[in-house]
From Swiss-Prot:
Localisation: Cell membrane; Cytoplasm; Nucleus, Nucleolus
Limits of the RGS domain: 83-199
SMART domains in the record: RGS
A Pfam match: RGS
Phylogenetic placement of the source organism: Eukaryota, Metazoa, Chordata, Craniata, Vertebrata
Function noted in UniProt: Regulates G protein-coupled receptor signaling cascades. Inhibits signal transduction by increasing the GTPase activity of G protein alpha subunits, thereby driving them into their inactive GDP-bound form. It is involved in the negative regulation of the angiotensin-activated signaling pathway. Plays a role in the regulation of blood pressure in response to signaling via G protein-coupled receptors and GNAQ. Plays a role in regulating the constriction and relaxation of vascular smooth muscle. Binds EIF2B5 and blocks its activity, thereby inhibiting the translation of mRNA into protein.
Molecular-function GO terms, alphabetical: adenylate cyclase inhibitor activity; beta-tubulin binding; G-protein alpha-subunit binding; GTPase activator activity
Keyword Membrane among record annotations: yes
Name of the featured protein: Regulator of G-protein signaling 2
Annotated source species: Rattus norvegicus (Rat)
Modifications made to the protein after synthesis: Phosphorylated by protein kinase C. Phosphorylation by PRKG1 leads to activation of RGS2 activity.
Listed GO CC annotations: cytoplasm; cytoplasmic side of plasma membrane; cytosol; nucleolus; nucleus; plasma membrane
Domain of life, per lineage: Eukaryota
Main location: membrane
Region (Necessary to inhibit protein synthesis): 79-116
């Protein structure tokens, strides 16, 4: 079940317009929700950091079923700024970016992109058809729970294509969402406090010599 905060998404993933006719109280409530959500996800990501001792070497534990993300080095985090694909290729980078999008109420964009990546790898015609329908009902159709912001013409084309699903059913929509994230959310992510903290090299403290 989607939370109330998640359903209150801004589909084009742009800053909320404070001039909208919803009143100052509604806007204040939205901003409070956003701050709470961001704090929650920053806490979760910090937990991943604290439970990852050595970059590049995952911690193993028989009792732990939760995937542990490895703390990136500052050098690795800096690579994410070189290209959007560098960020998406990093498991921790992807987790951090998803948290950022969730704080902006537009996590559906990265979820749709990831669903399309999985869809394109599907070989079975039966599974392809089933996944196509699920992606359509989750992200494309009107009033979908995670509806993405694409034009009506593209939506209509997808509705026709999924009748006989192929791996290219969502190509146009995926490119649209990728471009939206790359040109809109990605630059703001690079300017975020959380990302800047990851890029900082740890300060080396020296203990005073005993006399």
């Amino acid at each position: 079940m989607q939370s109330a905060m998640f359903l209150a998404v801004q589909h084009d993933c742009v800053p909320m317009d404070k001039s909208a006719g919803n009143g100052p109280k509604v806007e204040e409530k939205r901003e409070k929700m956003k701050r709470t959500l961001l704090k929650d996800w920053k806490t979760r990501l910090s937990y991943f950091l604290q439970n990852s001792s050595t970059p590049g070497k995952p911690k193993t534990g028989k009792k732990s079923k939760q995937q542990t993300f490895i703390k990136p080095s500052p050098e690795e985090a800096l690579l994410w700024a070189e290209a959007f694909d560098e960020l998406l290729a990093s498991k921790y980078g992807l987790a951090a970016f998803r948290a950022f999008l969730k704080s902006e109420f537009c996590e559906e964009n990265i979820e749709f992109w990831l669903a399309c990546e999985d869809f394109k790898k599907t070989k079975s015609p039966q599974k392809l058809s089933s996944k196509a329908r699920k992606i359509y009902t989750d992200f494309i159709e009107k009033e979908a729970p995670k509806e993405i912001n694409i034009d009506f013409q593209t939506k209509t084309l997808i509705a026709q294509n999924i009748q006989e699903a192929t791996s290219g059913c969502f190509t146009t929509a995926q490119k649209r969402v990728y471009s939206l994230m790359e040109n809109n959310s990605y630059p703001r992510f690079l300017e975020s406090e959380f990302y800047q903290d990851l890029c900082k090299k740890p300060q080396i403290t020296t203990e005073p010599h005993a006399t």
